[in-house]
């Protein structure tokens, strides 16, 4: 078994089919943007950072094979249209949309250079996608380390170990590696300061039971799986020190879209006086939206709720509502928002990120908010 969600080399992309985990580890070749769209939509690959990476790398594979053109204008349009198509696969997560804007701008700027060639445009876009892969791994390690230190200072300033509850899957399988919220747990474990981790089952797709539990067992991190409906009991009776979750989109006021069930976790955590953290790269922050009310929430097929492994478990004829995400209001994020740039209170996020981005040169290395 492996925790490597994405295998990439110039001109070749493979993804780990996460629908088969933990029973089977099988890689699937992705040779086109259309194949990537299908894999993302089917949730063979999931997690906001991984979705963006697979989408953009699939475009890089096509460009390496000479797709696009002929002519600079046609090539730039090809890049823009392919990226726009990828955004439609799962619209709630902002990472793919941001990467699409950035890469389209890169292609357009390169095409405007004096003496520009199709080969140069392709090479520039490919290099930028490869840089994204490396940057995501660096950012995740920073998130893990910064989050672990902040959490320990908040809940265990005199030393000792902490117990953390998390939701869905935010680890190596959802990113280029290491993870965001699960990266914080990894960092706590490596410091010898993690007493225990609780992970939710995360219905209806069971990302917690299938993927997070798999990662925790793989790395021998002490952990217990619970159902989504057990979180209040766990906080009341199992000594939970903090809750750390990931994010698919964080907007300007700190409202956060994440896997459905996150909102209720935050409510229960506040009731019990337990710090609630969101761990996400700055690429998951969307300062163009003011509040969570503006976030488009993806709704998934009802069959995902009524059937398990192809066997129907719900009464025939029952109606189904299956939103993939919910929005946690910023005032419930009591621990802070952990990014690779630091840990910020929700009300600090806009200023902190705007200040950081304005000090950069506006290239792909500095995500445009």
Curated annotation (Swiss-Prot):
The entry's keywords: Acetylation, Amino-acid biosynthesis, Cell projection, Cytoplasm, Isomerase, Methionine biosynthesis, Nucleus
Matching SUPFAM superfamilies: NagB/RpiA/CoA transferase-like
The biological process GO terms on file are: L-methionine salvage from methylthioadenosine
Which pathway, metabolic or otherwise, does it act in?
Answer: Amino-acid biosynthesis; L-methionine biosynthesis via salvage pathway; L-methionine from S-methyl-5-thio-alpha-D-ribose 1-phosphate: step 1/6
Any keyword Heme? no
What's its EC? Answer: 5.3.1.23
Q: Summarize induction of expression.
A: By RhoA activation in cancer cells (at protein level).
Sequence positions bearing N-acetylmethionine: 1
- Which residues does the annotation list for site: Transition state stabilizer? 168
Instruction: Fetch the InterPro entries from UniProt.
Output: IF-2B-related, IF-M1Pi, IF_2B-like_C, Initiation_fac_2B_a/b/d, M1Pi_N, NagB/RpiA_transferase-like
Pfam families from the UniProt entry: IF-2B (PF01008)
Main localisation: nucleus
GO CC terms in record: cell projection; cytosol; fibrillar center; nucleoplasm
What would be an example GO MF term here?
Answer: S-methyl-5-thioribose-1-phosphate isomerase activity
**Catalyzed reactions:** 5-(methylsulfanyl)-alpha-D-ribose 1-phosphate = 5-(methylsulfanyl)-D-ribulose 1-phosphate
In terms of domain of life, where is this protein from?
Eukaryota
Indicate the enzyme's highest-level EC class. Answer: isomerase
Q: Active site annotated at which positions?
A: 248
Report the locations given in the UniProt record.
Nucleus; Cytoplasm; Cell projection
* Similarity comment: family membership: Belongs to the eIF-2B alpha/beta/delta subunits family. MtnA subfamily.
Q: What does this protein do?
A: Catalyzes the interconversion of methylthioribose-1-phosphate (MTR-1-P) into methylthioribulose-1-phosphate (MTRu-1-P). Independently from catalytic activity, promotes cell invasion in response to constitutive RhoA activation by promoting FAK tyrosine phosphorylation and stress fiber turnover.
Q: Which NCBIfam families match?
A: eIF-2B_rel (TIGR00524), PRK05720.1 (NF004326), salvage_mtnA (TIGR00512)
Cross-referenced HAMAP family: Salvage_MtnA (MF_01678)
Q: What is this protein called?
A: Methylthioribose-1-phosphate isomerase
* Organism per entry: Homo sapiens
Gene encoding the protein = MRI1
């Amino acid at each position: 078994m492996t925790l490597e969600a994405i295998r990439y080399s110039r001109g070749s992309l493979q993804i780990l089919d996460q629908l088969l985990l933990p029973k089977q580890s099988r890689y699937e070749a992705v040779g086109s943007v259309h194949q990537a769209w299908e894999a993302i939509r089917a949730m063979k690959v999931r997690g906001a950072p991984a979705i963006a990476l697979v989408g953009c790398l699939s475009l890089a594979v096509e460009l390496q094979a000479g797709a696009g053109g002929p002519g600079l204008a046609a090539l730039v349009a090809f890049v823009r249209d392919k990226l726009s198509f990828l955004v439609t696969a799962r619209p709630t997560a902002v990472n793919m949309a941001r990467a699409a804007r950035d890469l389209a701008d890169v292609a357009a700027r390169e095409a405007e250079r004096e003496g520009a060639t199709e080969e140069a445009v392709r090479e520039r876009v490919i290099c930028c996608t490869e840089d994204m892969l490396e940057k995501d791994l660096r950012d995740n390690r920073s998130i893990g380390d910064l989050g672990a230190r902040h959490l320990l200072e908040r809940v265990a300033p005199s030393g000792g170990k902490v117990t953390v509850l998390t939701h869905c899957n935010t680890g190596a399988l959802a990113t280029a590696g290491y993870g965001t919220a699960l990266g914080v747990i990894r960092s706590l474990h490596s410091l010898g300061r993690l007493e225990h981790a609780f992970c939710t089952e995360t219905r209806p797709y069971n990302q917690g039971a299938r993927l997070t539990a798999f990662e925790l067992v793989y790395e021998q991190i002490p952990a217990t799986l619970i159902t989504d409906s057990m979180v209040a009991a766990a906080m009341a009776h199992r000594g939970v020190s903090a809750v750390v979750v990931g994010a698919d989109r964080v907007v300007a006021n700190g409202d956060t879209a994440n896997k459905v069930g996150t909102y209720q976790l935050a409510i229960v955590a506040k009731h019990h006086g337990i710090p609630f953290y969101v761990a996400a790269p700055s690429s998951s922050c969307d300062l163009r939206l003011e509040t969570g009310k503006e976030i488009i929430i993806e709704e998934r097929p009802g069959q995902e709720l009524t059937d398990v492994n192809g066997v129907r478990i719900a009464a025939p004829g029952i109606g189904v509502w299956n939103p993939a995400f919910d929005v946690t209001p910023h005032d419930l994020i009591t621990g802070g928002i952990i990014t690779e740039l630091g840990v910020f209170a929700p009300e600090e996020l806009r200023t902190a990120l705007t200040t950081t981005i304005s000090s950069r040169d506006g290239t792909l290395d500095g995500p445009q908010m």
